[in-house]
């Protein structure tokens, strides 16, 4: 109320829950994530373990499996065979895929410059006003930048990986995220693969700076310092040959840029990876999430399983069941297995410690 005229203030503008005219603190009426009066975001102090709805505003929230368990008491649901059919179907609110290109020097070929393709998945409702975690997914041998997103695989039904991300986000089984899919090949017809050193350089020099400059991520800019400061919000994964890149380029060489790691049906010199992450300049960098998995009948099962065990055993920053997880899936070396493992991994990736939610 105005002290001069005695009239009630209409509270036209609030900042941080306080009226800028009369100083009245908003009483808050939180609904679906925001206060209906001052538009302040709900603090989400807790959510129901079954409905996943915030106990204050009613908004459905993804679990945050920090140390393998959400603060609400829920634990992740892992599948070990093909997912329920609904996750492979088109989603009512699909994300979009943007096809981009970038110029890159091939350091192993005298810095020859080539133009490369890059696919970027944006979740439904993507907004420049929000910040998003970023997951780089790398294809396997003979595949390309489309395999993790839009390429169709026949499993008696059309299996398109993008549908899994769309449906998980729609059902609040994972937080909305940006997925970046580059190609390891530097020539036509799946030729001229530059190896993990070249991909590590591309991620550091070009891909991550490009994503940070063109999309709404937690990195304030594409500078190396800003990317390093936001590393907890960047992850890298891959299947088959892509798993070698995820661990070799990502964990072994670019640990200062990535903190979440996903490895399916492959591994890259685990002792060398362990030695690199324990180096003096890397030993204090947290690794909040590491997931690996393979099919029971996959020829890469042994490399995947034992490689995971070696890396976990060689560092005190990884504890199986808390921030390191391995799953065997009923199947072989194919996208049926990888579709299950990406579901298992995405519900846990980018863990955030939250009180009561």
Task: List the model feature ranges, each with a label.
Residues 1-76:
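Extracellular adhesion/carbohydrate-binding repeat motifs centered on closely spaced tryptophans
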Residues 77-357:
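Non-catalytic cap/lid and distal C-terminal segments of serine-dependent acyl enzymes
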